[in-house]
Amino acid sequence: RGLTRQVSAALSQWGIIPDDSAGMPLHLSPPGRLLRQALGILGKGVSTPTLLALLKHPLAHSGGARNEHLLLTRDLELYLRAKAIPFPQSAGLQAWAQKQNNPMALSWAGWVSDICAAHWPADSAPFADLLSQHLTYAEAICRGSRPDEDDEAGGLWQQKAGRQARETVKALRAAAASAAAVLPFDYAGVFNGVLAQNEVRDRDAPHPKILIWGTLEARVQGSDLLILAGLNEGVWPQVPPPDPWLNRRLRHEAGLLLPERRIGLSAHDFQQAIAAGQVWLTRSVRNDEAQTIPARWVNRLTNLLNGLPENGGAQAFSAMRARGDAYLKRVESFESWQPAPAALRPAPAPPKAVRPQKLSVTEIKTLIRDPYAIYAKHVLGLAPLEPIEPVPDSRLRGVIYHALMEQFIKAWPDCAPVDRRRRFVEISEALLCAQVPWPSHQAFWRSRLRAMADWVIAEEERRQTRGQPLVLEGRGAVLLPELQFTLSAIVDRIDMSQGAELYLYDYKTGAVPTPDQQKVFDKQLYLLAAIAQQGGFETLQPGEVVEAAFIGLGAAKKYQAAPFDKEPLAQAWEKFKHLIASYQSEETGFQARRALFRVEDYSPYDQLSRCGEWSLSAPARHEVLK
């Protein structure tokens, strides 16, 4: 059956559906797939990938307003990707629907919420009840939020496959009356097994001249061209199944047939088939694991012909191979391609009017290391899609740690010294429960946070002696009037001493930039300090920043101050203005991967820049755009 599916998939390139004598397995038909998807959600709950796969099924919401359903599904997918929501909930879906400019959005979101909320009973239940709940749920999915009149199940039970599925379900429902109570897990196994045992054949849809036969059908039917496929040992003939109870001698004494009888029947089928008018003998040279071995009768035929040179056997065999090679070359021509010239390293130079006039502090590092990413994001307006299945990655860990430090610092004045660790643990636990719905990562991050609690408290006591927190997660911006450029930022924390001196901190859960990196590439602390000194942050008057530092919250707990002694803040600010002025000039191109930290570092726009077709040592192609 695997070879049949491969051949059918290849023929689908030309819109050809072969007439398969075995039909399509019912569980692989559209109704079968939807019933199994519904079964999976009832048993395991809904996640973003499973929900989107269900909503995009061709039978989902087939009862009416299918076009609006597909439009809303697309918008919902973009929302779930952007917000990195692993498990959609009713409240979030309703909040999203209220922001949509679509009169159908609210009712549609309610329908999706019902899909997400469905689940099996906790304990065992009568088989008939589980079957009724399953079918009612599947019909509601197909009916949709705005069904047509007298439409109870959309297209679920329509077409040949739908009618066959309905007959199978009727037979199962009749047998369910005498079944005992079962667990939902056992019901799922029975239902999937029943679907897999049934097949669907549509005599009208397939091509009338392309047929896929089994050995039984090939014995009694003829064709103009017969292709004998899968001629490898273990496929044709198949390996006899092992008998765990009787060996060959005992089987013979009991009067049972030996396993080798099946090989004899396969040889008989091959002998009949190869006598057709025109025959192709085909086999795969490799499978998933290693080289394959030709079937024994192919080897026998090869040896026989090559062993009869005086009778023209070798010439006949060579002619057979030549005719086969001619067809193989045709197949290879379908897949041939003309090599395209390798792209040059791009460095587009767009007009000044479309160049970015506002960047955030964190984007300045990208502008220095990979200017092409800034061009793609701000000039072309391209943003990479988030993965369809959110994962608890370093970005989420950073969000958790930043929120923890913000809430903990706010609660610091009201906590007695003996209660600080307890308060730290309470805040971390609330954040993990609310934003990390993966139990394994919850446990792992919980252990790391509790292990660092004493260090955080001790370091915080030291920092509180120098100044009091004045700004937490504060937004700010500063305008460069001579360049008409705005630099925006979000600062994690700014403290003020009694002498009105400012201490600026930024939390890092990953690697902390070294002083040399801060001088050249990572200018975050310098730029935050410059904005603070100019009074660019809300609720903060201009003041002198005497120290700006990264606080490492990762495995290596590190405190790294900006090297103001090696490069004064005023000097760094002048360099920044020169950088912005350079990229506002139409002579400067946004070069791809200009100075990434490591060669293997990934940029979300590598595919757009055709990275891999050019080397990092290659000169950039400066292209002035109009």
Where are these regions (language model features)?
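Metal-dependent nuclease catalytic regions and adjoining charged, substrate-binding loops involved
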Residues: E310-A314, S318-R321, L328, A532-K626
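A non-catalytic, helix-rich entry segment at domain boundaries
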Residues: I400-R475, L479-P481, A562-P563
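Feature representing long, continuous alpha-helical segments
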Residues: R33, G189, G193, I374, ...
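Metal-dependent nuclease catalytic cores in nucleic-acid-processing enzymes
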Residues: A218, R261-W280, D516-I551, I580-Q584
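Short beta-strand or tight-loop elements
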Residues: P206-L211, S266, Q468-G476, F485-V491, ...
